[in-house]
UniProtKB/Swiss-Prot annotation:
Disulfide bonds join 45-112, 185-192. GO terms for cellular component: cell surface; extracellular region. PROSITE patterns: CUTINASE_1 (PS00155), TAT (PS51318). It comes from Mycobacterium tuberculosis (strain ATCC 25618 / H37Rv). This is Probable carboxylesterase Culp2. Its main location: secreted. Residues 1-43 form the signal peptide. The keyword Membrane does not apply. Its EC number is 3.1.1.-. InterPro entries: AB_hydrolase_fold, Cutinase/axe, CUTINASE_1, TAT_signal. Gene3D superfamilies: alpha/beta hydrolase. GO terms for biological process: lipid catabolic process; symbiont-mediated evasion of host immune response.
Amino acid sequence: MNDLLTRRLLTMGAAAAMLAAVLLLTPITVPAGYPGAVAPATAACPDAEVVFARGRFEPPGIGTVGNAFVSALRSKVNKNVGVYAVKYPADNQIDVGANDMSAHIQSMANSCPNTRLVPGGYSLGAAVTDVVLAVPTQMWGFTNPLPPGSDEHIAAVALFGNGSQWVGPITNFSPAYNDRTIELCHGDDPVCHPADPNTWEANWPQHLAGAYVSSGMVNQAADFVAGKLQ
């Protein structure tokens, strides 16, 4: 197997293992009652906002999958859809991304309470989203968990190539989002589809961002989220 590909797969596997450990050690909770008063929405607040974490090694922004997803979603809803690119190195630092995503969701919930939020991510960015939505306590570098009631501001969740699939759907660990989460794995993508390591190299192209776009899965996710924003 190609050395670079091997390192990437092992790194993604390690990240998935760490995430799995966090999820399995975290008690399942269902959020309730957002504390305190919230500010009224302003004209600067969009109807909806996608809060997206890009995949590993992608340049700053929301990445190939994120851009395609936002573009497709905007074409399907007659609403002002904003976008926030989660700020993190997109290497191995899931906790950095999770802290930033959580902080932004909390900020929007307070400053734009009527804005419907759509957190999501691709590959490592999906792992970032997993931590934010499924881990209600501080652990392993994640220091800014969502307060109870935050789920009231989240309309839908869109995840692509999510490594947590090795231990089960993320909705097993965050049941509050069960009916508003779409989690997609392309074919035999080795990151989200448990498989024999001997097949990883052959199946690696199925994890690439372009595969999720060209297969129609990004459009499928946009259809799902559009339905939740109606």
